[in-house]
């Protein structure tokens, strides 16, 4: 029996509709209505350091030799011990510190400087795979062996990145998203240590090396920069989805190699400088 062109067209159209319906069923968004969401019992945001360092992907940027590694080492030791830092509670648990620019001898010297007692639940590595070669699996394996892991610090982020020249927003964002997904999967804090750009910027949070895709994909970002208020100090600028914006004035104690708090804008909001003054100081500083 001959089939007319109109019938063939109708049959073809029906097949396409069935195929598209099947595809669309698989591509539907997974959604939840507001009423159901409000009735769900969800875990509150967890913190490695209460109100300061949330679970998820965090990034700490700072100029070379300013003291980022000293700060991260102190954080990891205190989390492993369950000791407060700057009067903020820590969640006690295993800490992993990938010191990829250091040797074990240097780490030992620094530990001797900052503490009299090194806890057994802080672990160090001086080499690791790149992200494209299996870093995430290495961290997964460590957390599997140490289920109480609270923090994994990577110092520095640049060492584990892909070895290419792509510094676009899309590439930066995607790399950070991979590590954020890992932090969310393992329910830990991953803290990346990163460098700042050489050129100045009136907004400290725009100084991270690379595009804004790096800070944009992170749960929290911290910039340790030369203080605009004191000659021998530093300011830690903090911002994130689950923390309040704050500026913490710090002083480096050369005797015990620890960063000590001078003031905190969360407790004393009046110490925040107006944006115009901040921009002027930054301009003058980078002209010197």
Where do the protein language model's features map onto the residues?
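Short, small/acidic-rich helices and loops at N termini and domain boundaries
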Residues: 1-26
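C-terminal regions of RecA-like/P-loop NTPase motor modules
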Residues: 20-24, 30, 145-148, 185-186, ...
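Conserved inter-motif catalytic segment of the P-loop NTP-binding fold
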Residues: 26-29, 35, 43-44, 48-49, ...
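Short gly/ser/thr-rich secondary-structure transition/capping motifs
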Residues: 38-44, 202-206
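Pre-Walker A (Motif I) flank of P-loop NTPase domains
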Residues: 54-58, 93
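Phosphate-binding/switch region of NTP-binding enzymes
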Residues: 59-61, 65, 69-70, 98, ...
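Hydrophobic positions on the alpha1 helix immediately C-terminal to the Walker A/P-loop
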Residues: 71, 75
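Gly/Ala-rich phosphate-binding loop of Rossmann-like dinucleotide-binding domains
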Residues: 80
């Amino acid at each position: 029996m001959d089939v007319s062109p109109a019938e063939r067209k109708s049959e073809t159209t029906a097949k396409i509709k069935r195929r598209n319906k099947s595809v669309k069923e698989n591509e539907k968004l997974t959604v939840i209505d507001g009423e159901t969401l409000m009735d769900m019992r969800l875990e509150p945001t967890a913190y490695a350091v209460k109100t300061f360092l949330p679970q998820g992907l965090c990034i700490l940027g700072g100029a070379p030799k300013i003291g980022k590694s000293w700060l991260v080492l102190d954080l990891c030791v205190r989390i492993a011990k369950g000791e407060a830092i700057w009067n903020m509670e820590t969640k006690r648990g295993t800490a992993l510190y990938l010191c990829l620019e250091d040797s074990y001898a240097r780490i030992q010297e620094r530990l001797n400087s900052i503490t009299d007692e090194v806890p057994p639940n802080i672990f160090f590595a001086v080499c690791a795979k790149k992200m494209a070669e299996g870093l995430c699996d290495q961290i997964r394996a460590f957390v599997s062996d140490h289920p109480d892991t609270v923090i994994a610090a990577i110092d520095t982020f640049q060492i584990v990145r892909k070895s290419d020249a792509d510094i676009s927003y899309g590439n930066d964002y995607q790399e950070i998203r991979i590590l954020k997904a890992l932090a969310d999967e393992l329910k830990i804090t991953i803290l990346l240590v990163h460098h700042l750009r050489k050129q100045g910027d009136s907004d400290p949070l725009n100084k991270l090396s690379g595009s804004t895709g790096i800070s944009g994909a992170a749960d929290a970002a911290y910039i340790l920069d030369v203080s605009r208020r004191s000659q021998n100090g530093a300011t830690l600028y903090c911002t994130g989805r689950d923390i309040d914006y704050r500026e913490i004035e710090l002083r480096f104690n050369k005797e015990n190699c620890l960063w000590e708090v001078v003031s905190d804008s969360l407790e004393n909001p009046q110490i925040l400088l107006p944006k115009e003054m901040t921009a002027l100081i930054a301009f003058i500083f980078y002209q010197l």
